[in-house]
Amino acid sequence: MLAAEKRRLLHKTRPVSASEKPGSIYPQRALYLLVCFSIATISLGYLHFIGAIDIGRFGISSVISDLTKQDAVSEPFSLHKEQTSSVHTESDEQTFELKHIFHHGTGPENYRLHRRLDITPSYLAKHSSYFADFSQRLAQKRDDSSVDSENLEDIYNLMDWPDVHKHKNPFTIQLPIKKDHKKGKVVRLKDRHEPGFLDSYLSYALQVKGDPKILNRIALEWEDEIEIDIPNMKDKDTLVSLATISSNAYVKFPKDENEKNKSDWIDVGQWEPDQENVDLNFGWEDIGLRGHVFVSKDNKTVVIGIKGTSGAGLPGGGSDETAGNDKDNDNLLFSCCCARVGYMWTTVCNCYEKTYTCNQDCLEKELLREDKYYQAVLDLYRNVSAIYPPETTNVWVTGHSLGGALASLLGRTYGLPVVAFEAPGEMLATKRLHLPQPPGIPKFMENIWHVGNTADPIYMGVCNGASSTCNVAGYAMETACHTGYQCVYDVVTDLGWRVNLLNHRIHTVIDDIILAYNDTAQCIEQPPCRDCFNWRFTSHDDDVPDEPEMPNPLRPKPKPKPSSSTSDGKNNRISSTATTTISPTSRKADPTSSDISEPSESPKKCLERTWYGWCSKWGYDGDVDDDQ
């Protein structure tokens, strides 16, 4: 070790010889160039003397210049290439800032409410004192020592603004994002932006239960394959900026003293203020879905950040915001059957039938209800696209946790690039919604990336079971399968982390994972995966019989249908189902006869059972135990 360090220091401090100085031409090379030049001159002069060539056509001066300046040109050329590359990279980078906040109401009473808040210079000046105090609180040192890592509600209520931006105001922050120099490819529905088109398609797909044979008869019109801008998933700063937008969606906005007037907000939905019912005008922001819209300087690219599960809000006063609705939608999207984990659980829908049996039709209808988050996120996108036309604007979607799953569902519906952070598995919800997909689309054209880490139990799909933290908090997070690409940081192997709910926080993802690694995680396709494999999903209003019941070892096997066996003359038995019953005399057949009849091999009842109830011996009523 010391010898190597010594050699390094000696090499560093030794003088540079004259032959190593850049641009110097030592005598050996000068002599070599002189000899070559002399031979070339004599040869060309001889050829010109005999009239074979014309020296003027060769440009001898340029040849000499190239020979003498070869070393000097090579180095500046490489630098020029690097400069050209850097200029190309800089052109791919744009700066984004918050322009709008959309709030869409949910629930039976507020689902028609939809409002927009524009972040203008006048709005920032109006609430300057609030933002000054807000920035000071964000700059304070984070103290998570008293947090119970086994309490999901405590973790959701932690301040989750990343340390890398702790001195910046979330409402005025500017974030650099690079687009990939390689375009993404996509195939989209031609009429996806026509009013009512997607709603009618999803409703019809629900009626036919997503049967591809029936849906293919509709002959949906798909656009030709086109190239679109996608985020650079290999750029660390881009990932940090997108994750920060996801974190920004948790920020609580300033509230006026006279909350009823809401002079800063603009109604963009069907809801109209009801002066007689004050409850609809007060506290409306506590129920619903929120999206923060960041726009590039040239207004050509828009990034929508979908808010995740509350409790992870930043300081700013107010209530727990959308916690109640978030929990209901979590349990609807990511559970096998309405969060029916045990008999003491209160389900979020009435689709449960019996043990490990659920009504599939009921589940699909619940997901498409107008007062649920999927319809809300579709309406939110429609209002964003009304301001920024999709024909001239690139729209990307991002989100954390529940927001990431909703972003994935929205992106798959409209063909938008999506980057989701620590989202629970949304493949099950995608199948239940019967989202439209172009036939034969390859994985690389989905443009959906899920960023996660192996120490997050929610992303990995292991936060379930009777003793899990999610279960104790009332969250049925039973899905593990994602769509699109998975970009997973293996912090358990690389950093020795343990699985903990604190690793689900967006602050941890930004400060301790993305920025801690030298390179971004490799994105791979989702391996074959299936959620809720032990559940039986039924449908009672179709002509196709339901799936057969799962075998029950505690129940005697049914009596088989009688069958007769005949010989084909080659000692091969041929069985055929008979419609008549077998007579008792058929058991005693003539030994000389080629037709042989035997009782069915399947027993009729259980003769012996083990101590835990498994049948160990089957037989008929009149059979006697051989051991007796």
Curated annotation (Swiss-Prot):
Residues 562-586 have a biased composition (Low complexity). Its main location: membrane. Its EC number is 3.1.1.3. Coiled coil: none annotated. The keyword Zinc-finger does not apply. It comes from the Eukaryota. SUPFAM superfamilies: alpha/beta-Hydrolases (SSF53474). Residues 1-32 are cytoplasmic. It is a single-pass type II membrane protein. It catalyses: a triacylglycerol + H2O = a diacylglycerol + a fatty acid + H(+). The chain crosses the membrane at residues 33-53. It is an enzyme of class 3 (hydrolase). Residues 54-628 are lumenal. It is found in: Endosome, Multivesicular body membrane; Prevacuolar compartment membrane. Residues 591-600 have a biased composition (Polar residues). PROSITE patterns: LIPASE_SER (PS00120). GO terms for molecular function: phospholipase activity; triacylglycerol lipase activity. The active site is at 401 (charge relay system). One of its GO terms (biological process) is phosphatidylserine catabolic process. InterPro entries: AB_hydrolase_fold, ATG15_Lipase, Fungal_lipase-type. Residues 540-605 are annotated as: Disordered. Keywords: Autophagy, Endosome, Glycoprotein, Hydrolase, Lipid degradation, Lipid metabolism, Membrane, Signal-anchor, Transmembrane, Transmembrane helix. CDD domains: Lipase_3. Belongs to the AB hydrolase superfamily. Lipase family. Binds to both phosphatidylinositol (PI) and phosphatidylinositol 3,5-bisphosphate (PIP2). This is Putative lipase ATG15. The gene is ATG15.
